Amino acid sequence: ELEPGTPISQVVKADTLVEVEVTPNRPDLLSHNGMAYELAAISGRGYRPVSIDDAGVALEPAGDFVRLDQPELNPYYTAVKISGVKVQESPEWLKECLVAVGLRPINNIVDITNFVLHELGTPLHAFDAAKVQGGIVTRTAYEGETIKALDGQEYTLNCTDLVVADQSGKALAIGGVMGGEESGVTDATTDIILESAWFKPSSVRATSRRLALSSDSSYRFERGTSAWNVLRGSVRAVELILQLAGGTASPTYVAGSPVPNPAHASMPSCGGADGPVSVFASLKQGKGATVTNELGFVQLPWKALDQISGGSISHEEGARILTALGLKQVPDSPECWLIPPHRLDLTRPCDLLEEIVRVFGLDGIPSRFSGPFVAESPVDAAYNFQMELRRKLAALGFYETQ
């Protein structure tokens, strides 16, 4: 529809590319949602969270549909079966979002999983349900077991690699790294199983390095993802799939339970509460079980902020910064802070101090001595005498020899 010679600027929308160097301790920044928290705190503008309607989500114990044979490597797994989907090309807005972050659109199902990965930082995978016999089993691979991954390459696994398989024993995916080509979504797919899970970082890292196979999912899993996001990512993806591909969704089948950050789980009581608490709504699984997202406390004495900043940062500004970063003050305990589950790196008072000073900016803290007087030692006096003597002798024409 365009005439030859049409300027590219009239076809491609203007955009701004921002490259961010993310340190290994900040996996929360590997998503637009996490980056929004950061920008809100630095700019002082409000944070608008992604709207996820989880009020009507039905959770059920997975039972025989999902079996975790290696819970130390994969303690938490959720699956949703969506029947009657129409696999087709994604709408323009979705394709534009993926192209903007350097991804190639494939189809609406795969594109949605990639979109949620970058939006929330939750790795997801969709299986063609017709290629899955029985249910899902996560286990370690058999020695010498092979799988052809989505990149078209065949990989030989060993007994330390985690795989997602079906109940016939066939490997469907390399856990946390990449899905298998045979069970992938195609244009002929009508029913899918959506996976959202938490895999042990060290396991994913070891498999990814040994196979020389990296993906956007493994990049996040090996740095540590929040168990809090497992359910949120699934709910968000199901919502988009029903909108763009149609179909009917089953309840969310849950196997295992979220693993809280070990450092948070070991924190002492604070603000009158004992141990970690849940501030994310508990959702009924049935049979009395609940899915919760555990948070930890960090006690931050404001006098520590006064000492490190020399009084340059007010308590109110410190509280504003922490609140903008997603932390919450415990009622009636202004020095006690609830850590958001996506901030796995905040476990000590010094971590909170670092966040405040980093966002406030070191340039805003004036350099000055801690007191009006500087003590002088005998060593200083001897050095000063030697230097003065050298200057006087040099002025008289003498040369110093060593």
Regions found by a protein language model. Give the residues of each.
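Cys/His-rich finger/ribbon microdomains and the adjacent scaffold used
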Residues: 44-48, 272, 400
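Generic low-complexity, intrinsically disordered sequence content enriched
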Residues: 284-287, 326, 397
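Structured aminoacyl-transfer and RNA-binding surfaces used for tRNA recognition/handling
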Residues: 105, 399-402
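Intrinsic disorder/low-complexity segments
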Residues: 257-291
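RNA/tRNA-interacting regions in translation and RNA-turnover enzymes
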Residues: 1-261, 291-362, 366-382, 387-394
